[in-house]
Amino acid sequence: MMRLRRLLERMLRRCCFRDCSVRLTKSLCFKKLIEFDATKNQIVTKLQRLKKKFNNAVKNARKKGQTEDEVEYAKESEKKRFDLSIMIWGSNGVLVAGKSSKKKVAPKEMKPEETDAKVVNEGLSIGREMVPFGSSCGLDESKLTTGWENVEDGAEKREVEEKWKKFKDKLFELLYERSVLMNKTEAMMFKAES
């Protein structure tokens, strides 16, 4: 367990994207980070099992109506593993479960509810999104997060947060299109080999 946790920590330091397990299957860049002998298949299998454990923990927590802070662990190492898994496969520290059913169900039409909702300050999550981008540009992470926390709540801050959300959505769309294109390319290569 200790070796796997170290591997995950190193993966997080090495890459800033959340598709570490996908990148691992495509290259052996993480092979150098491992202190023990393991084949590519063993590493991939280990990561797949870890992701499955993470998804199961998320599903169980959701069934119980718990958040990530309320989930109880038998061992401290399990908590550390779960925290690392959230950083890799989670979404801004929010528990995300995969689709449980394989059937496609037609979505029900929902009428938008009219409520007096207050704007929730999501500055911390926006600050987290800025940190990887800023650190890749050579900016100090701690100054970015503390600087964003010091900005007063207001219309201008909400406008910037909305722009970051739109940017994040566009980035996800681009990553999805890239994975579809990669899948199509691999299918063409496989077809050419056979």
UniProtKB/Swiss-Prot annotation:
| Top-level taxon of the source organism | Eukaryota
Q: Does the keyword tRNA processing apply?
A: no
Name of the protein in its database record? Probable transcription factor At4g00130
UniProt record similarity statement: Belongs to the GeBP family.
Q: Give the matching InterPro entries.
A: GEBP, GeBP-like_DBD
Q: What species was this sequence derived from?
A: Arabidopsis thaliana (Mouse-ear cress)
The UniProt keyword set, sorted, is: Transcription, Transcription regulation
Q: Name one GO biological process term.
A: regulation of DNA-templated transcription
